[in-house]
Amino acid sequence: MRCVKTMRRRTEKIVEAWAKGTSGNIINPISNNQNMPNDDYFFFGILRGSGDMMKRANSYYFADHAYFKAGHDKVPAWYRVTKNAHVNSDLKDFPKDRYEKNFFRTLKPWRTTGSKIVVCPPTGAVEWYFDSHDWLETSIKTLKQHTDREIVVRDKPMNPQVKRIDGVTTIN
């Protein structure tokens, strides 16, 4: 297992913990003009060479900020980890006890009416990684074919003006 440095103090500790737990070796990012040894890799984030390496790796674990309770300074600090993918896209049936214990929020009923759909375009890094430079334009065009609701574009960070929304479209 080769654990790739992030070159950032706050996230380097995550790489170090993964390396310790897997008996992995911490390495610098391998540039595109160098061959990557056939091995398992661990990456945190897609910046500073990790994204390019992930595209070339045969087998890897990818970690990034969690969807719930994200943040390096929270106790406990939560992250998402995937195998050979940027996000987990398989729907699986799991017992709900861990969700209820750690993240519980009352889910509201699915809405089929409303006036606004929020589209959250990718950040520059995600747009680069997925080569999705036309994602926003394509998504809005597709939505307009299926709805007459107002479409609101919300860049990061969260826009407090968008309080009442009825649908959300994101890249990941």
Please place each PLM-identified region on the residue numbering.
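A short secondary-structure junction signal
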Residues: 127-132, 154
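Short His-Asn-centered micro-motif
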Residues: 42-46, 63, 120-122, 153-156, ...
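Catalytic donor nucleotide-activated moiety binding site of glycosyltransferases and closely related
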Residues: 5-6, 136-171
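A short, well-structured beta->alpha microelement
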Residues: 15-39, 163-172
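A nucleotide-sugar donor-handling region in carbohydrate enzymes
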Residues: 58-59, 63-129
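Short catalytic/ligand-binding loop motif for oxyanion handling, primarily in non-cytosolic enzymes
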Residues: 49-53, 69-72, 125-129, 159-163
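Short hydrophobic beta-strand segments
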Residues: 1-17, 21, 43, 114-129
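Extended catalytic core of nucleotide-activated donor transferases of GT-like folds
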Residues: 25-74
